[in-house]
A protein has these predicted regions:
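Cytosolic C-terminal regulatory domains/tails of membrane transporters and channels
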Residues: 1-38, 499-662
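Membrane-interface "cap" regions at the ends of multi-pass membrane proteins
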Residues: 2-63, 74-77, 105, 116, ...
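Extracellular loop-to-transmembrane helix junctions
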Residues: 65-125, 129-134, 139, 150-179, ...
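Loop-to-transmembrane helix boundary motifs in multi-pass membrane proteins
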Residues: 130, 169-177, 274-296, 372-406, ...
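Helix-loop-helix junctions that connect adjacent transmembrane segments
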Residues: 203, 210-261, 470, 474, ...
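Hydrophobic alpha-helical segments and their helix-loop junctions in multi-pass secondary transporters
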Residues: 205-235, 302-310, 430-443, 492-501
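Extracellular/periplasmic helix-exit of transmembrane alpha-helices
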Residues: 216-227, 285-325
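C-terminal membrane-solvent junction of multi-pass transporters and transport-like membrane proteins
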Residues: 234, 380-391, 427-472, 503, ...
Length: 662
């Protein structure tokens, strides 16, 4: 029989809170959204850009800085080698832009080839095998956790460096955890609502960064006065021997550092189902926007930094001012009528660094759901919550990022060595997988597409190798160990689900439902009162032949109990179980073994009366024997436990004078 679907009624009628806890939950996270409204929660391109691209776009705040740091460590930032310093910077920036173009084209092709999302995991699994797919999945999940930790820690570091936050400067962990909680809260309200919240800061950063670059490069020709005293142009004494280490490895190291600009570029290909229809076209357009914005700002900031001869260094925990700080100070001034734009740029930079973590909150749960569908993670991660988001994945990501922040005390410099290794692992596997895909499909233009992806795979593999060699001793080896453990866990979960499916599979003819079985029904009673009546009625509905069981904890009460029972329920047999050690569970388990039938399918049903009160604190005044007994019987496949509730409506207590008269 098929039950016809009822038409969805007004949300106010179907989602009315049934309790105070439910009211607060809906107040904080919003009312549940029915499945048929899922399309309305999908993202238009203008909201999808900040949700999925804030990680990539925010990286321009430190990508150029990381390049200058690597070149400065080789002494190229010295005044005598300024031409080589500028030339090397542009060689690295140009190489990264070419790599960004290749990766963006690759993922644009991936979007149309794999419209269900999944990105590197799906591509690697389908074309290179399940093992490589799990490597990509583990790398991405680790990178998403690190993105949250690094982005929030970096943003908090920027915020706490301002004079207004001096009191919190030495307490970054609490502030970081607060931002993690806020991001969890925003994303649990729904992807569309989080996009609305985060769109403002993302677009503000893009606007202010573009204004800074434009005024810095073109402003002097139009009469705009720069403030070169805000720029650091020197290295500290003894920092490096000038020009001593110019070579291929220095360039590769600067290239690897600068490739932090590419973290997050795979996010859109993972989140295709979150886009409005047509999903693939909208996702591809958003990816193009992201690559253009990222590339333009990256080139512009690098151009302005080299034209102003910005130098960045780090020594013994001390650093030069951040490159973004130097550039905005040089363009707007740290004093004067435009100083508010300088502070606005610092706030916008800190905000987008914090919000960069939101990309992970969009993609980590979605990738987890795909892994759960493939039976490599628990099935709970495939379920959407009331707000049509993957709540379990959001919570797990927040917990892992919070633990990481606590372990590393919110220190960005200690977190950075772990970063980017995972994402370049995923890049390499994804693009290698696409090469196999094009060779197998051999559609129009397949050779050119395969060449593009092959070049991208080679380039990202080189970056991966450089990062692994350079940052491995600094802690990146931890990422490899964790990834191996995750893959072992994925395999173990998958084996369990395969065994479970084999156990539950129905082969051949449909099983007979009329096989003989004996069901012995026992009603556990602790006294003769109105609270046991619903349980007795329920037991009679199961079978007219059932027993009431009383465990004798206080022997002196037994005669009264038996007399009252015979007077009120003479037709129901009462079994009294002695319990010399005052145990409720032990005697009952022994009796179950006595009365259980001998057949393999025979069952014993234990019916437990339970009180249900209007106020939660009233429940604390009642015996908890029922839950303890249910826990003791939990592992018994031949015993079913049923709780039958009696709703208590306590009458108002009589006045003291009435109690005296009685």
């Amino acid at each position: 029989m098929t039950v016809p679907k009822s038409s969805p009624g007004p949300r106010s009628l179907t989602n009315r809170p049934s309790s105070a806890a439910e009211w607060w939950r809906q107040f904080l996270f919003g009312p549940p959204i029915p499945t048929h409204e899922q399309e309305q929660t999908r993202l238009p391109k203008l909201l999808a850009l900040p949700v999925f691209s804030s990680d990539a776009i925010s990286s321009v705040a430190y990508a150029t800085q990381e390049i200058l740091l690597a070149l400065g460590a080789a002494g190229l930032a010295a005044a005598a080698h300024r031409a080589a310093y500028t030339r090397a910077t542009w060689e690295v920036v140009g190489a990264i832009c070419v790599l960004l173009l290749i990766v963006a084209l690759s993922y644009r092709q991936t979007i149309f080839a794999y419209p269900s999302g999944g990105g590197s995991y799906i591509v690697s699994k389908d074309n290179l095998g399940v093992g490589f797919g799990l490597v990509a999945a583990a790398a991405l999940l680790i990178d998403y956790v690190l993105t949250v930790a690094v982005s929030i820690a970096s943003g908090v570091q920027n915020l706490l460096s301002t004079p207004a936050a001096a009191a919190l400067a030495h307490q970054p962990v609490g502030v970081c955890l607060l931002f993690v909680a806020l991001l969890m809260f925003a994303n649990m309200r729904g992807l569309k609502e989080s996009g609305v919240v985060f769109a403002g800061p993302t677009y503000l950063f893009i606007l202010l960064a573009a204004v800074t670059v434009a005024l810095g490069l073109l402003g002097p020709r139009l009469g705009w006065q720069l403030h070169p005293n805000a720029v650091n142009q020197t290295l500290p004494a003894g920092y490096a021997a000038a020009g001593s280490a110019l070579g291929l490895f220095v360039i590769l190291r600067a290239f690897a550092n600068g490739c932090s600009a590419m973290t997050g570029t795979e996010a859109i290909s993972n989140g295709i189902p979150a886009f409005r229809r047509p999903e693939c076209a909208n996702a591809a357009t958003t990816l193009t926007w992201m690559a253009l914005i990222l590339g333009t700002l990256f080139v512009g900031i690098s151009w302005l930094a080299t034209s102003l001869h910005v130098v960045y260094w780090e020594k013994n925990g001390q650093t030069a001012p951040a490159v973004i700080d130097q550039l905005s100070g040089a363009v707007f001034g740290r004093t004067g009528p435009w100083v508010w734009l300088y502070y606005a740029m610092q706030i916008a930079t800190a905000a987008i660094l914090v919000l960069a973590a939101n990309t992970s909150f969009a993609d980590f749960p979605r990738l987890s759901s795909i892994l759960a569908h493939d039976r490599f993670l628990p099935r709970q991660f495939a379920n959407r919550g009331d707000r049509l988001v993957f709540t379990n994945g959001i919570v797990l990501l927040g917990l892992f990022a919070g633990v990481l922040i606590v372990i590393f005390r919110g220190n960005v410099d200690r977190l950075i060595p772990l970063y980017a290794l995972g994402v370049f692992t995923a890049f390499t596997l994804s693009q290698a997988g696409m090469v196999v895909h094009w060779r197998r499909e051999r559609g129009p233009g397949w050779l050119l597409k395969a060449v593009v992806n092959g070049i991208g795979a080679l380039a990202t593999a080189v970056v991966f190798a450089v990062i692994a060699i350079e940052k491995g001793p600094e802690g990146a080896w931890i990422v490899g160990v964790v990834a191996i453990l995750m893959i072992v866990l994925f395999r173990a979960i998958h084996r369990y689900y395969v065994r479970l499916a084999q156990e539950l599979r129905l082969d051949g003819e449909a099983p007979a439902l009329q096989t003989p079985m004996q069901n012995t029904v026992l009603v556990l009673v602790g006294g003769v009162h109105r609270g046991i009546v619903p349980a007795l009625r329920y037991a009679r509905a199961l079978t007219p032949r059932f027993q009431a069981v009383y465990v004798e904890i206080e022997p002196e009460r037994t005669p009264i109990m038996e007399a009252n029972w015979q007077r009120l329920f003479p037709e129901v047999p009462l079994v009294v179980l002695e319990s010399p050690y005052r145990s409720l569970v032990g005697p009952l388990l022994d009796y179950i073994e006595q009365v259980k039938g001998k057949g393999p399918d025979d069952m014993v049903t234990v019916v437990i009366p339970e009180y249900f009160t209007d106020d939660w604190w009233d429940a604390l005044l009642h015996n908890t024997a029922g839950p303890l007994l249910k826990l003791a019987l939990l592992g018994r496949a031949d015993v079913a436990v049923v709780n039958v509730r009696y709703h208590i409506h306590p009458a108002p207590a009589p006045a003291p004078s009435e109690q005296v008269r009685r």
